[in-house]
Amino acid sequence: MNAVTESAATTAEMPVPFVFTDAAADKVKQLIDEEGNPDLKLRVFVQGGGCSGFQYGFTFDEEVNEDDTVMNKNGVQLLIDSMSYQYLVGAEIDYKDDLNGAQFVIKNPNATTTCGCGSSFSV
């Protein structure tokens, strides 16, 4: 008689690599609708620069690259390239509209320091 055992690793759920909030997805959907191009996707990336060493960037893209991680939320596709992915694991991508203005906000547990503008960080 053969027995099959399952390890905890095979039965546990994989952690969500990042959180794309409803508010962020809804705002992106609104912006895509305004552009009139349903093929647009939101690309979030990290690049060198800013006062803390790295900075976040957002752009619309029609293409999904081979190394992209794709997240679907509320009819919107979020793209993160493989280099940026390592800096964004565990992060939350949100959209805030309050007295300080309207903007996309990234809460990143990997950032050891951030600057006052909120778009630059170091690890």
Curated annotation (Swiss-Prot):
Superkingdom of source: Bacteria
Binding site for iron-sulfur cluster: C51, C115, C117
Iron recorded as keyword: yes
InterPro entries linked: FeS_biogenesis, FeS_cluster_insertion, FeS_cluster_insertion_CS, FeS_cluster_insertion_RrpA, HesB-like_dom_sf
Cofactor note: Binds 1 iron-sulfur cluster per subunit.
UniProt xrefs under PROSITE patterns: HESB (PS01152)
Record's subunit section: Homodimer.
Similarity comment: family membership: Belongs to the HesB/IscA family.
Annotated function: Required for insertion of 4Fe-4S clusters.
NCBIfam families, alphabetized: iron-sulfur cluster assembly accessory protein, PRK13623.1
Protein's name in the database: Putative iron-sulfur cluster insertion protein ErpA
